From Swiss-Prot:
Family matches, as Gene3D superfamilies: Lactate dehydrogenase/glycoside hydrolase, family 4, C-terminal, NAD(P)-binding Rossmann-like Domain
GO CC terms: cytoplasm
Subunit structure: Homotetramer. Interacts with PTEN upstream reading frame protein MP31.
The protein, known as: L-lactate dehydrogenase A chain
Amino acid sequence: MATLKDQLIQNLLKEEHVPQNKITIVGVGAVGMACAISILMKDLADEVALVDVMEDKLKGEMMDLQHGSLFLRTPKIVSGKDYNVTANSRLVIITAGARQQEGESRLNLVQRNVNIFKFIIPNIVKYSPNCKLLVVSNPVDILTYVAWKISGFPKNRVIGSGCNLDSARFRYLMGERLGVHPLSCHGWILGEHGDSSVPVWSGVNVAGVSLKNLHPELGTDADKEQWKAVHKQVVDSAYEVIKLKGYTSWAIGLSVVDLAESIMKNLRRVHPISTMIKGLYGIKEDVFLSVPCILGQNGISDVVKVTLTHEEEAYLKKSADTLWGIQKELQF
């Protein structure tokens, strides 16, 4: 007896389903799900896989997204505790880890998250040996180093979300002061994602007009307009949001999909993201910090050599020393 499906549809071809543009998200907490919905809304993948250790939440999140399939253009949304669901991913986004508590510095989280990564990374490598790894979990610079060490991947394929969000926050706050959309406000925050990030005031501009040329005190203590406070707001903003709503999610999700789009579409846009910067700016250790990187289908193909002041370079070096001080104590 022919089934309804057989009566309706005549099959012409036996297909083997191998995804071409699969994205996996490890961790279905607030950040992971913000990444997931952002990716789905941008139509970046032909398959999205979700992985977590909390099976009920994982299944619930998957079903909730699947029920919206009519409104999406991603034909397959899967999930599982077993990493075999991640097979053949082009991009794996890692958001899993111990959550930052109110008032806790990102660096306090380290060893707890290293232990989690020791389980996650080998499983990803096993099922998607050619993927790009995008690390979002905090402290992101150190955990990108950890992912690089454990995976054995070349450094171009291990990327930290780094200062992409810090720079976005900076441009938003700058735009609010000037009454200009953030897309037209240009400024870069480099170095460590978080407390010791470095604003490059010399490069801040609108329509190619340097703000430092118009206002030489920009970013200094002598500045009567206190533009330095904009960077302080950037540093404090995550703590403030965590204090108010318990965690951050939407902005980091949007920031991550911005990076995912550059990778999946080979856009070769420049982003302030965390990469191995040994040999740059007098840094001699294996540390990952954010510098402007060209991002495309192979991950990070190039870095842009930014002209920094002596003071900015010293801050970057200090960040590197702080991170290395922690990294060399880590138990793998």
